[in-house]
Amino acid sequence: MRTLLPVAALACLTAGPCAAAELPVFDAHIHYSHDAWPNLPPADAIAILRKAGIRRALVSSSGDDGTQRLFDAAPELILPSLRPYRTRDDTGVWVRDPAIIAYLEDRLARYRYVAIGEFHVYGADADLPVMRRTVELARQHKLLLHAHSDVDAIERLFRQDPAARILWAHSGFERPDEVRAMLRKHRNLWCDLAFRTEHGSGGKVAPEWRAAFAEFPDRFMVGTDTFTPERWHYIVEHANWSRAWLADLPPALAERIAWRNGEALFAGADRGR
């Protein structure tokens, strides 16, 4: 029986706010998909995450075997999320393919997860039967939904399950004022900042994003998004870039966005296989 282990104690917890260079990182957006496997064995992938100072990573893969391989290699580091994609070819069609439900149900019966996603769904497609069943599975298994979606789709998901917990991938690629409006409306909505740079260009936090972070200090987290194999070689650089702009925030707020929010969101994830 394998176990999702609680995160190791961090030295800076008792030493006060961490210096920017020492900030651990919770990466909320990692993929280890089939096209990465041939040239990046699990041990090498884990070594990259550790070199970057990542203490935990939310990982989903196309297909899920990639996530399971990383979890087997480092269960104390990897938080498994079930992506509804068997290969990348499912990205644009999964929500109309009933076979995806059987895939999800099979994986959920065999393994433990903390989330379903990252998945792509937009607008009215969020009300299609496959998406509705996915929301039901998340509710049944008490899993977070990691949604790469527009505002319309997020609203539809919450109408289906007002108690759903949703991590909004890329903060929807929305403007910070729109992100703030959504966070005010939905208390169970969190945002990752993956594949965005405008919030911390040049090591300085943009004023409109600073206001968003200050209003919702417990709702944002960083992420790399290794959506292609090449992105794995950017993980260390991205972690250091994140530390640079986080250093422009008050230390307590920087710690929250860097890792505390992720740890809090998945605090109950120490469940057995």
Segments and roles (model prediction):
Residues 4-16:
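Bacterial N-terminal signal peptides
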Residues 2-3, 23-26, 43-60, 65, ...:
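Mid-to-C-terminal alpha-helical segments outside catalytic/metal-binding sites
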Residues 25, 116, 168, 222-223:
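Generic enzyme active-site microenvironment
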Residues 82, 95, 125-222:
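Catalytic pocket-lining loop regions of alpha/beta-barrel enzymes
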Residues 30, 119, 171, 224-226:
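Active-site metal-binding loops of divalent metal-dependent hydrolases
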Residues 65-144, 190, 195-198:
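Active-site gating/metal-coordination segments in enzymes
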Residues 30-42, 89-96, 200:
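Acidic/histidine-rich helix-loop elements
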